[in-house]
From Swiss-Prot:
Organism: Streptococcus suis
Pfam families, sorted: GARS_A (PF01071), GARS_C (PF02843), GARS_N (PF02844)
Keyword Nucleotide-binding tagged: yes
Protein name: Phosphoribosylamine--glycine ligase
UniProt: ATP binding residues: 134-195
Reactions accelerated catalytically: 5-phospho-beta-D-ribosylamine + glycine + ATP = N(1)-(5-phospho-beta-D-ribosyl)glycinamide + ADP + phosphate + H(+)
Keywords: ATP-binding, Ligase, Magnesium, Manganese, Metal-binding, Nucleotide-binding, Purine biosynthesis
Domain ATP-grasp: 108-314
PANTHER family: PHOSPHORIBOSYLAMINE--GLYCINE LIGASE, PHOSPHORIBOSYLAMINE--GLYCINE LIGASE, CHLOROPLASTIC
């Protein structure tokens, strides 16, 4: 079969690469993709993620069996609804089901309604009311833009002043446009964060290995929030009993709740969780695979990914099998200045071979050659599997030391929480 992946980042590179491993898959197209993907035999289609009718026409003309949608903004724009109306299958939630991600307030209301553990909160569109709530609650406190903001719409404020300023930027200064026209202000939860993913169709779901992401830009969890600077799986200090509790108290009730609400869920459900003294609680839901978690989870899958997704799409039982030993770890290399203003056009090191995989995100070919240049905030990610976190760190970081990363930066402590 021929498949289409919508998106352009490292996540979509990992999805397409894994689908291409299937003996049943003849071709994988990515729209619009990035030039780095072509080094793995992936074909790029020059159609943007918002061009739904062009994507639908391409899928029809090229006999695409189904489409895997990567990015949150495409889902929020109703791409899956449009494909389904055209009689095409797409793996991803409808616009209404994806509201779990594109409105933090909606997600909070659903969690309250169905008794799902999460932080106490208030939602505000009026700055003075938000300010009064912050002053009443005190700090630390978390201020979130209600809508999509590329993973950068969350401020963990250490002081009341910092929280008020974050609310002011969103509500009065229009920092995130319509996405920040409402803010959700939450109690700060202390604990270990982890990412739980499930492949879902209605009440049928399959839990993936649990990963830990590193959101802050710099070592020691310093600096601004980013889309993610690295991740690893498995999380050795997270007992299976915690995952089981999260499935019972969070995943099952949210999926049942969405069915009750008439928003039955299809696709990847991503629960960003935190292990508190009261057990796991939800920080956020996302309606798609995480980036960079996808790049470390999918290499551990030993079953046929294309067959698994095909089965789930058609509501057939499927069997996902995984590497059950060792650790897979990945480090993101980003452009200097990210997540704020960053440089572009930096020459990238050669693609790695052997047991270190390179997944590309912001990369393009130079005008007159096949040299890859940086073309985004997060540029590429190196991923490897080893017996222990330390072994994986050693492999990745020794490779990075040998690369010319002028104009780029990366965190040097990915996975270190697991080796304390």
């Amino acid at each position: 079969m021929k498949l289409l992946v919508v998106g352009s980042g490292g996540r979509e590179h990992a999805i397409a690469k894994k689908l291409l491993e299937s003996e049943q898959v003849e071709q994988v197209f990515v729209a619009p993709g990035n030039d780095g993907m072509t080094l793995d035999g992936i074909e790029l289609i020059n159609i943007g993620i918002s061009e739904h009718s062009a994507l639908i026409n391409f899928a029809k003309e090229n006999d695409i069996a189904w489409t895997f949608v990567g990015p949150d903004d495409a889902l929020a724009a109703g791409i899956v609804d449009d494909f389904e109306q055209a009689g095409l299958k797409a793996f991803g939630p409808s616009r209404l089901a994806a509201e779990l991600e594109w409105s933090k307030d909606f997600a909070k209301q659903i969690m309250v309604k169905y008794g799902i553990p999460t932080a106490a909160f208030g939602t505000f569109s009026n700055f003075e009311e938000a300010k009064a709530y912050i002053e009443e609650q005190g700090a630390p406190i978390v201020v979130k833009a209600d809508g999509l903001a590329l993973g950068k719409g969350v401020v963990v404020a250490e002081t009341v002043e910092q929280a008020v300023e974050a609310a002011r930027e969103m509500l009065l200064d229009n920092k995130f446009g319509d996405s920040g026209a409402r803010v959700v202000i939450e109690e700060f939860l202390a604990g270990e964060e982890f990412s739980l993913f499930a492949l879902v169709n209605g009440d049928q779901f399959y839990i993936l290995p649990t990963a830990q992401d590193h959101k802050r830009a710099f070592d020691g969890d310093q600096g601004p929030n980013t889309g993610g600077m690295g991740a690893y799986v498995h999380v050795p200090h997270l007992p299976q009993s915690v995952v089981d509790t999260a499935v019972d108290t969070i995943v099952k009730p949210i999926l049942e709740g969405m069915i009750t609400e008439g928003r039955s869920y299809l696709g990847v459900l991503y629960a960003g969780l935190i292990l508190t003294d009261q057990g796991p609680k939800v920080i956020e839901f996302n309606a798609r695979f995480g980036d960079p978690e996808t790049q470390i989870i999918l290499p551990r899958l030993t079953s046929d990914f294309a067959q698994n997704i095909d089965d789930i799409l058609h509501k057939r039982p499927t069997q996902l099998t995984w590497l059950n030993s060792g650790v897979t770890l990945g480090v993101v290399v980003a452009s200097n200045g990210y997540p704020l203003d960053y440089e572009k056009g930096v020459t990238l090191p050669a693609k790695t071979e052997g047991d270190i995989t390179t997944y590309y995100a912001g990369a393009r070919f130079a005008e007159n050659s096949r040299a890859l240049l940086s073309n985004g905030g997060r540029v590429y990610m190196l991923v490897t599997t080893a017996d222990t976190v330390q072994d994986a760190q050693e492999k990745i970081y020794s490779e990075l030391k040998n690369q010319d990363t002028t104009g780029l930066f990366y965190r040097t402590d990915i996975g270190s929480k697991a080796v304390k």
